[in-house]
Structures are given as structure tokens and as C-alpha cells.
């Protein structure tokens, strides 16, 4: 039987672009694990995406996943927009390169390993796990240790 894992993610950026971070809560049965990391220069969308990528990469085997994010960009991108981007060779409808294609491709690869049910919650609305992720992401952004090598200034 496939394990069911709950994942909650959030990204934060102090300035956009600026220092950023992600926060993750993973829950399997009654066990919770938190992850976070800060980056010196990035964007809020990249941190939202990276949170989902890292969370899914953390799972050692294919799982049934309920992934909750407060990012419509991530949820809509992976459930709706990505299909046409792939058909067009990672180009938008107006033939421009898809922003954050490196992370979209990583997220696409990870979602193929798992059975993911995407959920959206309003940020800063008292959702327990989202508030934990937000705090983890903000704290990580305030203490960045990594470089976001995929970040490309527009």
C-alpha cells in the first residue's frame, strides 16, 4: 500500500528579488518534520516552487501526497499551465521562455514520481501548518546561506 504523506510549503522573499527562503512541513501519520533553507538573492515565486520541489525530493519512495501551498502560481502552474509549456518546448503562448523553467522541470519530474493532490490555502489566514511554513521561510530568508544558481534577473 502506498504511503500517504501530507506536505505544506511556503516561500518568502525580503524584497522581490532579494534574500529568500522556503519552509516545509512534512507529515506522515503522527510524525512531523520541518525543513527550511535561505538564499541570498532570489524571488518569492522561486522560493514557493523550490519548497515544493525539495519536499517531494525528500520522499524516499513514491507516495500519495496531499500538497498544500498558499501559492496560486505554483498550484496553477503545475496543474494547468505546464501542459502547454511542455508542448511548446518551454515557451509561453507569446513564444517567450517560461520563467523559472529550471524549477518547473524539476517539479514536473518530482510530481511524476508521486500521486500528488494539490491544495491551496489563503496565506496569513491562521492555517496552522501554513503559518509554521511561513515562519520557517521568513527566518531562513533572514539568514541566507545558499546561492540560488537558477535565478536570472529579468
Swiss-Prot record:
Q: Which GO terms describe its biological process?
A: DNA replication, removal of RNA primer
GO terms for MF: magnesium ion binding; nucleic acid binding; RNA-DNA hybrid ribonuclease activity
Q: Which superkingdom is the protein from?
A: Bacteria
Kindly report the protein's main subcellular placement as a broad class. Answer: cytoplasm
Indicate the segments forming the RNase H type-1 domain, all copies. 1-142
Query: EC?
Result: 3.1.26.4
How, per the record, is the cofactor bound? Binds 1 Mg(2+) ion per subunit. May bind a second metal ion at a regulatory site, or after substrate binding.
Catalytic activity field: Endonucleolytic cleavage to 5'-phosphomonoester
What's in the GO CC field?
cytoplasm
Q: Which Pfam families match?
A: RNase_H (PF00075)
Localization per record: Cytoplasm
* Keyword terms: Cytoplasm, Endonuclease, Hydrolase, Magnesium, Metal-binding, Nuclease
Q: Which residues does Mg(2+) 2 bind?
A: 10, 134
Q: Which residues are recorded as binding Mg(2+) 1?
A: 10, 48, 70
Look up the record and name the cofactor or cofactors this protein needs.
Mg(2+)
Task: Describe its function.
Answer: Endonuclease that specifically degrades the RNA of RNA-DNA hybrids.
The record's similarity note reads:
Belongs to the RNase H family.
Q: Which PANTHER family match?
A: RIBONUCLEASE H1 (PTHR10642:SF26)
**Subunit organization:** Monomer.
According to UniProt, the name of this protein is Ribonuclease HI
This protein's gene is called: rnhA
